[in-house]
Structure formats: structure tokens, C-alpha cells
């Protein structure tokens, strides 16, 4: 490993969170009933309901079913018809340039512009639109593309497939460029690496500050590569079943946190094949046999200050973990139906760091029971309950100053944007005719653009 590569993965010092108690996981710890000092967001449990202008739409939804009117801003149908799009991600500087990457069941990925033609946005972005920007088809996979994402600076993209490959593409820069992105500057891409793992890719994660990729695999291994060289930094192998999730924890991303169907959560120094710590989250010490359908970890998130991890399980449980040592914390988060898996987790700092610590921090969990819960991290209280008619597949948060907005995607063919402070439904996004597998939120312009990945092979876009 070069000195430059080591610098990208330098170890971080994480401080133990002293707000909540550490306990042994005996399943009998009561929820903390102390009053929450964060009065601004303290309220009784709220079942998500209609927001302004949503009442009529909700009244009509039951009758319309699959015939809901399409209220999207535009549609992109690049993947093969009726073959699922599994993953969607927007450029980190979207809308400059306003491009996205998708991956699907047709063994392909696409770099494309989701902005419809003849729109005000395309005119303000050097005439970027679905008509003027030629999509780039990302080939090379021999099975479904299930993961895709951008490097931290948006100069590279990576796709991960069920064929065991991670393929990396890099932008071919023109000789002359401008501050305002143009079609010519972003239309040319070149494959630079085809990385082999020999087993199905489950998840893929770019480092937030460097050109490093981590990928979790079906055979329980986790791979790390440096780009653009393609050098293997490490192969981590302390899980015993499929690695289901992984991320570089905030605030600096110097460590790697991974989860598995074997119920293990592991913190790594990416340069070291040995774990910093390893914890069994949902597997009781006296359990006779590991059952991934009961004990497996299916979702993972870390708080903005890097002190607490949240893990969701295949049996509907959610637990908080100290990032310092991997201990289960006392706060209980009980709400999802037993036997229904937790599909997505998201920490949101509603005060944007103004209060310090975990004051104002909430956790949003979404599951196959069709519900999303907004939890107060310090007390475990449910602040709001959000509902879909079918399982929720994923969710995404909106950037500052709209941190209070979260958009959920569902098997009921809709996406919904919520104000998680109150549980109010801000908008219902319709147009899909099947399961919505993915959602991406514009990282700029106040997060007012929502882009989806659909089971019927199309991607839709809405303005919030």
C-alpha cells in the first residue's frame, strides 16, 4: 500500500457516547422514560397523515390503486422494459452536473440526465436535459447490477453486480472546461477497472473523502480497493455469512463498519485484517442455533457525530450500538411488527449540530410492515409513525435546510415525502406501476428533486 493510500485510511479516534447506558442484551431492559429536554420536537406519537393539499389525493388513492395518476416531472426508460432497476444515485454536485447513475436487472448501468426536456432547470444548467445529454451505457456485467455509486468528487462511478464484479468508470475530461457544467464536459466516460471478487456483490460504498471503494459479498468477505489503480487494499473475512451492509462512519470515514446475516457487526481499521471490535447484535448468548431469518442484520446507519450505530434486523428489531466498543445500548426501539425485516435506517440531526451531542438527533427506521418510525435517540420514544400500504423498500433524507424532510419508497408503487418533526405527509409521488426499489435526493438546491428506481424498468423524477 502506498503512503498516499495509507493517508486516505488513517485511523480515527471515536469518543464513547455517555448519553445512554450500555447493557447486556437480555431483552428485558425497559425503555428510558425520562423527559426529553428538546421541547422543540417533543410531541405525542403522531400517525403520519396528509399535509397541505394532500387530503384529496389520499382520499382517491384507495380507489385508484395501480391506476394512480402520474404526477412525476419526467420519466427515463433506458433499461430493458419490465426489468427491474435496483439502484439509483445522483451526482454529488447535482444539478451541476444534473446526472445520475442507475443499475438494473438487464446487467447494465446507465449514466444519464433525469431532467426532462424544455424545463427551466435544463436551461439554467447549460441546456442539460434528457434530450441533450446522451446516456452512457455501462456494460461489462453478466448478471444484474445491484449497486452503483459516485466517487466523492463525482469523477468516477462504480457498479457492483451479482456476477461478482465491481466495474469502475472515469470521466474523460475535455481539454477546456468551465465552472458551469456542460453536456460536452460530462458525456464521455471510460472503463478503467474491472475488479473480481468471485462472489455476488451485495453492497458497494465509496469513501466520502478519498478514491477508495468497499464492497460486501455473498460469501461473507468485504473487499477494499484503491482507485484509479485498482490495487486491493484488504480483504476482510471475519463475518461467517453474507455481508448485508457497510459504510465509512462519520465524521471522517477513517474506519469501516460492516454487518452480516450472521448477526455480527464489525468495526475495522481498513488497513488491518483484524477487527477493532466485533459484536453479535441479535443472537442471544444462550441461543442454540443461528437463524439468519431471525438474527440477521438487514440495515445499518451511524449518527452524524459517529458515536452511535443503529442496526435493523430481519425479525423487525432495531438496536443502538456504542461505536466506541460495540456494546448494545439501553435505549429500546420497539415498534416494527415481529418477523418483518427492517429495510432502511437513517439518522437525522434536526438541529444541524447546533445543540451538540445527540440533542435533536432522531432515527428513522423503515420496514416490510409498511411503517416507518421516527425515534428520539436519547429516550427511545416514537415521535411519529409513517405509513405505506405495502412494505417500505428504502428511504432517503433531504439536505440542509430541509433536514426535516425524508422520502420513503414502497412496494405500493408510491414514494412519500414527510416532515419527520410532525409526521405530516408533504407529498405523495405517483407514476410507478410496481415496486419502487430506490430513491435518491438532490444533494443541493435544498433537496427539491426526488429520483426513483422502479421494478418496471423506469426512473421517474419529481420536484418537491
Where are these predicted regions, by residue range?
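Loop/turn segments within WD40 beta-propeller blades
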Residues: 89-97, 148-154, 160, 204-211, ...
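WD40-repeat beta-propellers
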Residues: 109-114, 166-171, 222-226, 246, ...
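Acidic, serine/threonine-rich intrinsically disordered low-complexity regions
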Residues: 1-73
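A short helix->beta-strand "capping" segment at the edge of beta-propeller domains
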Residues: 58-87, 127-135, 187-189
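Beta-strand-rich domains and repeat architectures in extracellular enzymes and scaffolds
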Residues: 77-108
Amino acid at each position: 500500500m502506498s503512503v498516499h493510500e495509507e493517508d486516505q485510511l488513517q485511523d480515527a479516534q471515536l469518543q464513547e457516547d455517555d448519553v445512554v447506558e450500555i447493557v447486556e442484551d437480555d431483552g428485558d431492559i425497559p425503555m428510558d422514560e425520562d423527559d426529553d429536554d428538546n421541547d422543540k420536537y417533543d410531541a405525542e406519537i403522531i400517525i403520519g397523515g396528509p399535509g397541505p393539499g394532500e387530503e384529496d389525493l389520499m382520499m382517491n388513492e384507495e380507489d385508484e390503486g395501480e391506476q394512480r395518476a402520474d404526477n412525476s416531472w419526467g420519466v427515463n426508460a433506458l433499461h430493458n422494459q419490465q426489468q427491474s432497476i435496483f439502484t439509483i444515485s445522483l451526482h454529488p454536485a447535482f444539478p451541476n452536473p444534473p446526472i445520475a447513475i442507475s443499475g438494473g436487472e438487464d446487467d447494465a448501468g446507465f449514466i444519464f440526465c433525469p431532467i426532462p426536456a424544455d424545463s427551466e432547470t435544463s436551461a439554467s444548467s447549460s441546456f442539460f436535459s434528457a434530450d441533450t445529454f446522451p446516456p452512457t451505457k455501462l456494460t461489462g456485467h453478466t448478471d444484474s447490477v445491484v449497486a452503483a455509486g459516485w466517487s466523492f468528487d463525482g469523477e468516477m462511478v462504480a457498479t457492483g453486480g451479482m456476477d461478482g464484479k465491481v466495474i469502475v468508470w472515469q470521466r474523460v475530461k475535455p481539454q477546456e472546461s468551465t465552472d458551469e457544467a456542460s453536456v460536452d464536459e460530462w458525456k464521455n466516460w471510460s472503463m478503467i477497472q474491472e475488479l473480481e471478487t468471485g462472489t455476488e456483490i451485495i453492497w458497494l460504498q465509496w469513501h466520502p473523502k478519498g478514491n477508495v471503494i468497499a464492497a460486501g459479498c455473498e460469501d461473507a468477505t468485504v473487499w477494499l480497493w484503491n482507485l484509479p489503480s485498482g490495487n486491493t487494499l484488504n480483504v476482510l473475512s471475519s463475518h461467517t455469512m453474507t455481508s448485508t451492509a457497510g459504510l465509512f462512519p462519520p465524521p471522517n470515514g477513517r474506519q469501516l463498519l460492516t454487518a452480516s446475516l450472521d448477526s455480527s457487526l464489525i468495526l475495522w481499521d481498513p488497513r488491518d485484517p483484524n477487527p477493532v471490535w466485533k459484536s453479535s447484535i441479535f443472537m442471544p448468548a444462550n441461543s442454540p442455533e443461528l437463524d439468519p431469518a431471525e438474527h440477521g442484520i438487514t440495515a445499518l446507519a451511524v449518527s452524524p457525530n459517529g458515536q452511535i450505530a443503529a442496526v435493523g434486523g430481519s425479525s423487525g428489531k432495531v438496536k443502538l450500538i456504542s461505536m466506541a466498543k460495540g456494546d448494545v445500548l439501553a435505549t429500546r426501539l420497539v415498534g416494527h411488527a415481529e418477523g418483518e425485516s427492517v429495510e432502511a435506517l437513517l439518522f437525522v440531526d434536526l438541529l444541524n449540530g447546533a445543540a451538540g451531542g445527540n440533542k435533536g438527533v432522531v432515527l428513522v427506521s423503515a420496514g416490510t410492515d409498511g411503517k416507518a418510525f421516527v425515534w428520539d435517540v436519547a429516550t427511545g420514544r416514537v415521535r411519529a409513525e409513517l405509513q405505506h400500504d405495502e412494505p417500505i423498500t428504502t428511504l432517503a433524507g433531504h439536505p440542509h435546510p430541509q433536514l426535516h424532510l425524508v422520502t420513503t419508497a414502497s412496494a405500493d408503487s408510491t414514494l412519500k415525502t414527510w416532515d419527520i418533526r410532525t409526521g405530516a405527509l408533504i407529498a405523495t409521488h405517483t407514476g410507478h406501476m410496481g415496486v419502487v426499489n430506490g430513491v435518491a435526493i438532490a444533494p443541493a438546491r435544498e433537496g427539491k428533486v426526488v429520483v426513483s428506481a422502479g421494478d418496471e424498468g423506469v426512473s421517474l423524477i419529481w420536484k418537491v
